[in-house]
């Protein structure tokens, strides 16, 4: 990760490249040291926990590895929860309407598979709960309501 970013170079006058983060702390959530650093920083400044985006596209997941690593590593002892980013991935930010990954909610079988995947996180002592119930959020409530 760091090597790729440090290959940047000054392109025009006033253009400051490469930008090296403080203490070489590149943002790489697959790196345990990054997660430990973020956890320590959060605790130092009184942040209770993190809410991670969760991507589930009819059984296909994206960016799930960091949370799976957290689940397996008790040293990353910071409360967390999920926000289900339940919207199609598209290229709207480029001005195009191209859908890269459509959001599809599926039938009862797909919902059960999704639940079965999430329940291991909900049962983790670090997962944020209120009155013993796991908390979370939906990115796009209307889409869920319209689909059901």
PLM regions: where:
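Glycan-processing catalytic domains of CAZymes
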Residues: 1-148
